[in-house]
């Protein structure tokens, strides 16, 4: 029976381990951007589910206490010393992690990135939660659908080096002129997936742009912070908050009207898929363009020319369904 226990790395870092039975033959590290984030906690549940299905797998769930590349580098060095079999990482910086991950691969450790990617030379494959262009369009559409006359919107992202959010924002910017000409993107700010900083950045946007109609936050931390700012500032009906959110964390803001709709994929499936992919690499399956990989009950993926694949399309949550999904994740 797998269970959670604490893995102490340093006084500045925290981690939890989902420990398999003593007979476990594979150690797979699920390295996240930061601990204490509901999205990654849900992914860890999926990782545990995959380990149970596969059998003989020990999942180490770990990450820094704040979303920094430096924190992840320290953790990866510790995992190399532990001689884990695979590292599956959601990165805080696509380039800064490459040297330490190359070191891991040189030691025979399999490396994949998921959610937030690592540069190709620092991993063997990458699993996107969804198609990048589709996510970019979705986050804009979530705002535009409730702005028939158009208007000013701003984006509150995670860190300025976050691979996934930067790609989604770039995709959003590209489709604005063609598909959403009435939407005016006035600013992009960064809350570093920290609730206090995200709150301050949201307040700054509202103060700096008095005609702001929507805040788009493609981060589960930032979207909650922005919705709380709108709620506390009596701005419901004036500023709509949308983006990517966990239904369980965000239901109250759909209910009170500070948000009309948000989207996300299933983070449980994402962590589950990361473990399945790592397990297959450990077993000798080669990551190369065109290669097909099973991700268990989630389905199958095919790697593209960059050894990347997407898991699923984003799903929209609004008043009609958020009650149901808030009970799941």
What are these regions (language model features)?
Residues 1-3, 15:
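Short terminal targeting/anchoring segments and short Lys/Arg-rich nucleic-acid-contact patches
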Residues 3, 8, 23-329:
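A residue-level marker of the well-folded mature domains of exported/periplasmic proteins
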Residues 13-23:
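C-terminal segment of classical bacterial N-terminal signal peptides
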């Amino acid at each position: 029976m797998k269970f959670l226990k604490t893995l102490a790395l340093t006084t500045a870092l925290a981690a939890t381990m989902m420990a398999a039975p003593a007979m476990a033959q594979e150690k797979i590290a699920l390295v996240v951007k930061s601990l204490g984030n509901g999205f990654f906690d849900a992914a860890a549940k999926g990782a545990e589910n995959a380990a149970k299905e596969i059998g003989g797998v020990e999942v180490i769930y770990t990450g820094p206490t704040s979303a920094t590349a430096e924190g992840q580098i320290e953790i990866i060095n510790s995992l190399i010393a532990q001689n884990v079999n695979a590292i599956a990482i959601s990165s805080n910086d696509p380039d800064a992690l490459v040297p330490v991950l190359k070191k891991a691969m040189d030691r025979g450790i399999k490396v994949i990135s998921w959610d937030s990617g690592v540069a190709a030379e620092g991993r063997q494959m990458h699993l996107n939660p969804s198609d990048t262009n589709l996510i970019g369009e979705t986050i804009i559409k979530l705002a535009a659908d409730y702005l028939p006359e158009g208007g000013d919107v701003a984006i509150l992202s995670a860190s300025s080096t976050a691979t996934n959010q930067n790609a989604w924002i770039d995709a959003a910017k590209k489709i604005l002129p063609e598909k959403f000409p009435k939407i005016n993107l006035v600013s992009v700010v960064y809350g570093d997936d920290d609730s206090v900083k995200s709150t301050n950045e949201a307040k700054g946007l509202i103060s700096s742009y008095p005609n702001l109609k929507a805040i788009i936050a493609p981060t589960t931390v930032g979207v909650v912070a922005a919705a709380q700012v709108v709620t506390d500032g009596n701005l419901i009906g004036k500023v709509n908050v949308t983006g990517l959110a966990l239904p369980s964390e965000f239901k109250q803001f759909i209910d009170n009207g500070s948000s009309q709709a948000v989207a996300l994929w299933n983070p449980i499936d994402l962590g589950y898929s990361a473990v399945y992919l790592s397990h297959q690499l450990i077993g000798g399956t080669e990551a190369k363009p065109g290669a097909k990989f099973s991700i268990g009950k989630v389905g199958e993926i095919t790697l593209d020319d960059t050894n990347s694949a997407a898991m699923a399309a984003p799903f929209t949550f609004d008043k009609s369904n958020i009650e149901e999904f808030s009970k799941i994740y």
